[in-house]
Each structure stands twice: as structure tokens, then as C-alpha cells.
Amino acid sequence: MEWEAPALVLSASPYGESSAIVHLLTEDLGLVHGLARGGTARANRALWQPGNLIRASWRGRLPDQLGNLSGELVHGSAARLMSAPLALAMLASACAVADGTLPEREPHPRIFHLLTRFFSLLSLDPDMAGWGGMAALLRWEACLLGDLGYGMDLSACAVTGGSAELAWVSPRTGRAVSDAAAGEWRPRLLRLPPLFLDESDPGTVQDWRDGLRLTGHFLARDAFGQRHRPLPPARLRLVDMIDALQPGALHPDD
């Protein structure tokens, strides 16, 4: 059996003397694994960097076997972000989250297309990490949770049924709550940044912190928790990086 398709590199781990076990995300096959012979050799190492879009070729005897991978670079995101630490951290976090939550060989075309678009935007303008990149990443995490069956319901207030002034999310149910209805439960709720409700809103540094805490709660409890795994180190490093940012450092409206 063999196939060829555009694919995003999510991870590559050394195997043997010079090969690598590579995890890819494709539109039609979802998450797939393969053996890239010579993948850690100097001549091939750059191809298998997480975040790269490649034209992948997979060959194996059976679909569920670890087949042999080869590929050609279509768009190299990772190398373009080396001088932009925040953008690189965002890319690494997204790759690790997708790699750790998506089931193998289950198509998630929306997640593939959103992630491909996000990486392309980051690499075309790494500085956009402070002008909407974080908001795009957080919205992608929310979409991922939805596709995996753990989505939040941000359409209306769980208490009143209204759609105005939604400002909180129940950590138990994932349903939105308006600021007026939060009442004495406010300290127990997760803040809902406006960027989840308005795709034109890039958010502030505090919004990013609140957003990472919001999606991180459901990623940790549901997407990773159901697999008995912790949040990946790359996601935790991104949280630390955003926590260390000073208000106004990246966005004029902070």
C-alpha cells in the first residue's frame, strides 16, 4: 500500500543511527506515523522540522504498519521563525497539542486546514504573533476541542439563555455565563476573552493568558486527560512566555 499527500510535520524522533519516527497530519488520513530513513542526517534534518508543510510519500505492506516515509518540502515554516521566539513557541505548542490529542488515522480536515493556514501566516510575517497570532492559536485550540468532542458552548448564557455580555465559562460544563449571571460563582469560573466571540479581535496580553487558561483546562482534563497524559512541555513553555510578557509589549491597545 502507498499514498502521497500534502502533510504537516508534527514531530520527528530519532530512531537508530540516522532514521527518524515522524508524525504527520494529513487532510484525508489524519494523524499518521512513518519511518524516515536518514531523517536525522544533516542533509535531511531540515525537511522533518515540526511545522513544515511537505509532499509526503508513504509506503507499507498494511495501512496500520509503520511504513517508510519520504517527502519534498513545500513550505518551511520552522526555519522562518528562528528569529521570532514567540511565533516559534506558538508553532511548537500547536504541533505538540495536535500530535498528542488527535487519534491516529482519523480524518480531521478542518483542523488540518486551519493549522496549515496558521503556520503559513506565522512564517510569512513572524511579527504577527503579537497582532492576532495568539488569538488565532487559541481559536484553533477551541476548534480542536470541538472536533474531538470536548467543545465549549459559547452561544448563550447557561443561566439566562441570553447571548449578551458573555464573560465566563463553567469549568465543569464548558458553557458560557454572562457577567451579570455569574454572581457568587464568579471566582470558580474561567474568564472568556472576547477574542473567542469575535474573530477580528486580536486580544490583549491578559486575554491571551486567560485564553490559554481556558482552553488549557479542557485540553488537560479532556483531550489529554482521557489519554492519561499531561499537557505537552511546548504548551507549558508558551504559557510561561505569555505570562512573562509586559502589557503593551506587543500590541498597542494592551
Curated annotation (Swiss-Prot):
InterPro entries on file: ARFGAP/RecO, DNA_rep/recomb_RecO_N, NA-bd_OB-fold, RecO, RecO_C
Keyword hit for DNA repair: yes
Keywords: DNA damage, DNA recombination, DNA repair
Pfam families membership: RecO_C, RecO_N
GO biological process: DNA recombination; double-strand break repair
Family membership: Belongs to the RecO family.
Protein name as catalogued: DNA repair protein RecO
Species of the source: Gluconacetobacter diazotrophicus (strain ATCC 49037 / DSM 5601 / CCUG 37298 / CIP 103539 / LMG 7603 / PAl5)
